[in-house]
């Protein structure tokens, strides 16, 4: 099994948050606590190597750990953050989680590490019905393929998965860990459920 200490984990907070009215999702409060703090609280017992990908409000995010922005500017979606994370992390294996999922599994890192094989390039979480492409673990050897993918302007992650040795990690026993909060209404509803 890959040791969790040999991985870095990047919290993806670099999006435009258009469905949240453009507000930086990681800094939006849920029950008086920024969303990113929920993610950090879940990740910290699992790994000591946490980084943050943010393209705005970097000074605010620095209180939580090292922060870096995308190298491919104005690239929609998480792929720019994944690319930057692979460049910035000091480990060969780099995991990614979104900043707006307060219920991340307490054994997420371990599950990913257990699934690694010698051939693995990319691991992607699967909830039993759908793949969860922002809950993922990449080996740095994917970086040249990902760079070429972004330079071509490709947006369909499934195309990159086909170029790499991609495997899926089973989270069908805990699909709620992928609940993400994209709109003010979802945030309000989730806050009421959590209270």
Swiss-Prot record:
Binding site for GTP: 12-14, 25, 53, 70, 100
Keyword Iron: no
GO molecular function terms listed in the Swiss-Prot or TrEMBL record: GTP binding; metal ion binding; molybdenum cofactor guanylyltransferase activity
Major place of residence: cytoplasm
Locations listed in the record: Cytoplasm
Gene Ontology biological-process entries: bis(molybdopterin guanine dinucleotide)molybdenum biosynthetic process
Cofactor: Mg(2+)
InterPro entries: MobA-like_NTP_Trfase, Molybde_CF_guanTrfase, Nucleotide-diphossugar_trans
UniProt keyword annotations, A-Z: Cytoplasm, GTP-binding, Magnesium, Metal-binding, Molybdenum cofactor biosynthesis, Nucleotide-binding, Transferase
Binding site for Mg(2+): 100
Top enzyme category: transferase
Catalysed transformations (reactions): Mo-molybdopterin + GTP + H(+) = Mo-molybdopterin guanine dinucleotide + diphosphate
The keyword Cell inner membrane is assigned to this record: no
GO cellular component, one term: cytoplasm
Alphabetical list of Pfam families matching this protein: NTP_transf_3 (PF12804)
Catalytic activity, EC: 2.7.7.77
Summary of the function given for this chain in its UniProt record: Transfers a GMP moiety from GTP to Mo-molybdopterin (Mo-MPT) cofactor (Moco or molybdenum cofactor) to form Mo-molybdopterin guanine dinucleotide (Mo-MGD) cofactor.
Family the UniProt entry places it in: Belongs to the MobA family.
UniProt subunit comment: Monomer.
Notes on the domains: The N-terminal domain determines nucleotide recognition and specific binding, while the C-terminal domain determines the specific binding to the target protein.
Protein name per the record: Molybdenum cofactor guanylyltransferase
Taxonomic lineage from the root: Bacteria, Pseudomonadati, Pseudomonadota, Gammaproteobacteria, Vibrionales
């Amino acid at each position: 099994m890959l040791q969790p200490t040999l991985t870095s984990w990047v919290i993806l907070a670099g999006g435009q948050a258009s469905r949240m009215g453009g507000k930086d999702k990681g800094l939006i409060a849920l029950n008086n606590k920024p969303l990113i703090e929920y993610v950090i609280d879940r990740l910290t017992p699992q790994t000591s190597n946490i980084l943050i990908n943010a393209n705005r409000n970097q000074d605010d995010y620095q209180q939580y750990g090292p922060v870096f922005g995308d190298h491919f500017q104005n690239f929609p979606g998480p792929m720019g953050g994944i690319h930057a994370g692979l460049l910035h992390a000091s480990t060969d294996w780099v995991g990614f989680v979104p900043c707006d999922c307060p219920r991340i599994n307490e054994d997420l890192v371990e599950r990913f590490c257990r699934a690694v094989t010698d051939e693995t390039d990319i691991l992607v979480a699967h909830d039993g019905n759908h793949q969860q492409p922002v809950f993922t673990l990449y080996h740095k050897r994917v970086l040249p393929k990902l760079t070429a993918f972004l330079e071509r302007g490709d947006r369909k992650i499934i195309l990159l998965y086909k170029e790499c040795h991609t495997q899926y990690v089973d989270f069908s026993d805990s699909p709620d860990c992928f609940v993400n909060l994209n709109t003010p209404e979802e945030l309000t509803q989730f806050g009421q459920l959590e209270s």
